[in-house]
């Protein structure tokens, strides 16, 4: 099942950690990849990339793409590990949310999608 929208959320605690994890799940995941990364990457592999807005590099990140149905949610999913601190992850999330069909996830929504897509027992 695909709900028709793509959810985005910070998946690590807010604070001063060195690394923050942004998680995206849904039908616009490939659009996120095409918009912000200059190269395609394989499924289930960590990729060192530049998160770009046009020609401007916003951060150096590690990104992993999980192809549906072999992801936590059962949908296409992207995990972006960026530099920690609220300024960086807020900026990247704000840019991702400019893509039509992307929105902030509700609390527990990744798990809800996992359950709905029969990924949990």
State the predicted function of each range:
Residues 1-121:
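A glycine-rich (often HGG/GG-containing) alpha/beta subdomain
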């Amino acid at each position: 099942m695909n709900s028709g929208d793509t959810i985005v959320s910070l998946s690590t605690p807010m604070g001063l950690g060195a690394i923050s994890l942004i998680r995206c799940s849904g039908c616009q995941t490939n659009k996120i990849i095409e918009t912000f990364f200059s190269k395609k990457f394989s499924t289930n592999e960590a990729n060192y990339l530049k998160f770009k807005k046009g020609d401007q590099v916003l951060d150096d990140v590690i990104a992993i793409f999980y192809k549906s149905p072999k992801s936590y949610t059962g949908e296409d999913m992207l995990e972006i590990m960026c530099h920690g601190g609220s300024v960086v992850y807020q900026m990247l999330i704000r840019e991702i949310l400019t893509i039509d069909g992307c929105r902030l996830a509700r609390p527990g929504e990744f798990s809800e999608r996992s359950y709905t897509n029969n990924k949990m027992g």
